[in-house]
From Swiss-Prot:
It is a multi-pass membrane protein. The chain crosses the membrane at residues 31-51, 65-85, 89-109, 176-196. InterPro entries: CD20-like, ENTREP1-3. It is found in: Membrane. This is Protein ENTREP2. Residues 306-331, 395-408 have a biased composition (Polar residues). The keyword Transmembrane applies. It holds the Pfam family CD20. It comes from Homo sapiens (Human). Residues 347-365 have a biased composition (Low complexity). Residues 301-481 are annotated as: Disordered. It comes from the Eukaryota.
Length: 539
């Protein structure tokens, strides 16, 4: 129980103001309890006296007019009043008020009937004990002055002879009926008071709330409902304004704004690929998009070393500085000397270059084949990459798909013509029937991308007309190992093209479209390559 000076419990918000005031005022609650208990006592007395009067007489008039039904209604009303004191609910209070009003009318009728019967019994003074078939009955009637007998024309009253004196029974019945009349009158008064009190309490609170201003009560802060809660808010859906959505949890990854693209690397989230497992390279790394080393050639896999090899055709373009996360490096690829094809160099946008199978990146080989006269160097002379002339046409192994990517930092203009010159040189040197490039290698070199640009330029020509390809050899991987590396490299190129949303020049867009077409055409011949490689391995 809280102390006298402590804060009181807050009023239930769901109850009306009248009910809350009833709980706050202990005097009114005690009055309701007293009225309910009085009604219960009066009801019990009315019922008991009425049944006692019924037991003394067998007359139909008295029995039919005995108000025991008024006693039951008052008893029920008093019970509801006690419940309303214990639980001051709106429904219980209203029901108590209505039932008290009904009891007022019933008690008025009962009091009138009981008083009339009492006067009747009082007027029948002459009582005689009469036996009917061994049954004794007291018959009371009006006394005639001329005779001592009862008149058949007047009213008669039959009483049960509980004792020898019939006059004593009549007097007892008269007293009981007068008692019932008095109890009904008292019950009428109590029920009227209960009805008036409940009605005044409910109506006065509504009238005061309607006409009088709201008074400020210096209530305890703990008892006051804080403003802004659901109890003080009325939701108006017409004026409801939805709250602002929260900011995105992750910034956009593939925006190609020139100011921001040069400051950060290209972060691509690739799905787990067997290519990374095969060559121990984390494909999902934000700084390393693909391995810095191409798959080994078929001759090295089967144990047939070529006569001479060409190594390190692309050297490291620029060393990574402390503040620049992107660097450019070249691939080091062994190339057989007896091949008859164009040698293509490419760059990669990885944080570094892995050493080649024959030596470190950038170290020239003892003997490097020379390019034909008139061939343009695929790399800018200022970038530090050179290609030395060699005998005839040389080519990579057919299992090595050539990839050509862009550097994500630095001057984009120095890299754009590089792949274009390389592609033009390859097309001019390739002749029908030679194994200069596979379709995927040629298309990959066409896909050299610019690191910055407007994304709308990329969307201008989504389906360019592919340029005619020179007739190339349709050699396929001749082993399951080469087939696996070939398929993984092709998937990696396709994913890189799929995530490239930066702007490209017009000629580069045509190259990318041709590369997409070449990658699509290679899918049909994959099953044939696997089957042929399996046959060669069995032989």
């Amino acid at each position: 129980m809280p102390p006298a000076g402590g804060p009181r419990a807050p009023r239930p918000a769901a109850l009306p103001r009248s009910l809350s005031r009833l709980r706050e005022c202990p005097g009114r609650s005690r009055i309701v309890l007293a009225l309910g208990a009085t009604q219960m006592a009066l009801g019990c007395l009315i019922v008991a006296v009425s049944f006692a009067a019924l037991a003394l007489t067998t007359s139909a008039r008295v029995r039919h007019s005995c108000p025991f039904w008024a006693g039951f209604s008052v008893l029920l009303s008093g019970l509801i009043g006690v419940v309303s004191w214990k639980r001051p609910l709106s429904l219980v209070i209203t029901f108590f008020m209505l039932l008290s009003a009904v009891c007022v009318m019933l008690n008025l009728a009962g009091s009138i009937l009981s008083c009339q019967n009492a006067q009747l019994v009082n007027s029948l003074e002459g009582c005689q004990l009469i036996k009917f078939d061994s049954v004794e009955v007291c018959v009371c009637c009006e006394l005639q002055h001329q005779s001592s007998g009862c008149s058949n024309l007047g009213e008669t009253l039959k009483l049960n002879p509980l004792q020898e004196n019939c006059n004593a029974v009549r007097l007892t019945l008269k007293d009981l009926l007068f008692s019932v009349c008095a109890l009904n009158v008292l019950s009428t008064i109590v029920c009227a008071l209960a009805t008036a009190m409940c009605c005044m309490q409910m109506v006065s609170s509504d009238v005061l709330q309607m006409f009088l201003p709201q008074r400020s009560h210096p209530a305890n802060p703990t008892c006051v409902t804080p403003h802004g809660t659901v109890l003080h808010q009325t939701l108006d859906f017409d004026e409801f304004i939805p709250p602002l959505p929260p900011p995105p949890y992750y910034p956009p990854e593939y925006t190609c704004t020139p100011s921001t693209e040069a400051q950060r690397g290209l972060h691509l989230d690739f799905a787990p690929s067997p290519f990374g497992t095969l060559y121990d390279v984390a494909i999902n790394s934000p700084g390393l998009l693909y391995p810095a080393e191409l798959p080994p050639p078929y001759e090295a896999v089967v144990g047939q070393p070529p006569a001479s090899q060409v190594t390190s055709i692309g050297q490291q373009v620029a060393e990574s500085s402390s503040g620049d996360p992107n660097t450019s490096a070249g691939f080091s690829t062994p190339v057989p000397a007896d091949s008859t094809s164009l040698l293509v160099s490419e760059g990669t946008a990885t944080p570094g270059s892995s050493p080649s199978p024959d030596g470190p990146v950038g170290a020239p080989a003892p003997s490097e084949p020379a390019l034909p006269p008139g061939h343009v160097s695929p790399e800018d002379p200022g970038m530090g990459s050179q290609v030395q002339p060699g005998p005839g046409r040389v080519s990579r192994s057919t299992s090595d798909p050539t990839l050509c990517t862009s550097s994500m930092a630095g001057d984009a203009s120095s890299h754009r013509p590089s792949c274009s010159q390389d592609l033009e040189a390859g097309l001019s040197e390739a002749v029908p029937g030679s194994a200069s490039m596979s379709r995927s290698a040629t298309a990959a070199c066409r896909a050299q991308l610019s690191p910055a640009g407007d994304p709308d330029t990329w969307k201008t020509d989504q389906r360019p007309t592919p340029e005619p390809f020179p007739a190339t050899s349709k050699e396929r991987p001749r082993s399951l190992v080469d087939s696996k590396a070939y398929a993984d490299a092709r998937v990696l190129v396709a994913k890189f093209l799929e995530h490239s949303h930066c702007a490209l020049p017009t000629e580069a867009q045509h190259m990318v479209g041709a590369m997409r077409l070449a990658v699509t055409n290679e899918e049909r011949l994959e099953e044939e390559a696997v089957f042929g490689a399996d046959v060669l391995d069995q032989v």
